[in-house]
């Protein structure tokens, strides 16, 4: 049975994806970052905080896919943003993805057809009002995606999607 790991799988797009993977019969581990425990039959939910260096993942021996989609958006006018706002988005979106990929890569390489999926935003390409922090961090995700796709090819597929 294929094994998938969804970071940020407790709400939004991540939760919908987890349900789709479950319906397709795949074994799925999904992370959440709320203080309450989440339970769902057929899905292994684990607490994981991408900002906590002591938070670790239990990754299966063989992993077929990783989806990195923690939810965070800070919509403010540029003049009200601080360097800390930009740093937090970068830490969650980019450094968190790097950490998860580095932890998962040995298990991904043992799969026949592994895949990593990251999330960007159309705001990177088109520019949206009040999207400075998310556009900056997701722009970095797009660069990371291209770099890792070239580096890991042809064994591991790496893609980013940009929902509107």
Predicted regions and their residues:
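Catalytic Tyr-X3-Lys loop
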Residues: 72, 79-99, 117, 134, ...
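Active-site loop-to-helix junction immediately N-terminal to the catalytic Tyr of the SDR YXXXK motif
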Residues: 81, 127-135, 147
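Conserved Rossmann-fold SDR core element
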Residues: 152-163
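Alpha-helical segment proximal to the catalytic Tyr-Lys
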Residues: 106, 149-154
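A short, exposed helix-loop element centered on a Lys and neighboring polar residues
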Residues: 101-102, 146
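N-terminal Rossmann NAD(P)H-binding glycine-rich loop of SDR-like oxidoreductase domains
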Residues: 10, 18
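Rossmann-fold cofactor-recognition segment
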Residues: 41-53
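Residue(s) in the substrate-gating loop at a strand-loop-helix junction
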Residues: 121
């Amino acid at each position: 049975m294929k094994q998938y790991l969804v970071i940020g799988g407790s709400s939004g797009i991540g939760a919908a994806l987890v349900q789709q993977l479950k319906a397709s019969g795949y074994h799925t581990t999904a992370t959440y970052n709320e203080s309450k425990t989440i339970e769902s039959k057929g899905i292994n939910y684990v607490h994981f905080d991408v900002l906590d260096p002591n938070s670790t993942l239990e990754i299966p021996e063989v992993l077929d896919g990783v989806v990195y989609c923690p939810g965070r958006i800070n919509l403010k006018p540029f003049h009200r943003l601080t360097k800390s706002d930009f740093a937090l988005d970068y830490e969650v979106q980019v450094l968190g993805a790097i950490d998860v990929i580095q932890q998962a890569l040995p298990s991904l390489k043992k799969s026949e057809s592994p895949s990593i999926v990251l999330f960007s935003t159309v705001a990177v390409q088109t520019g949206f009002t009040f999207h400075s922090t998310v556009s900056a961090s997701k722009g970095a995700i797009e660069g990371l995606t291209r770099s890792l796709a070239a580096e890991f090819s042809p064994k591991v597929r790496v893609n980013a999607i940009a929902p509107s």
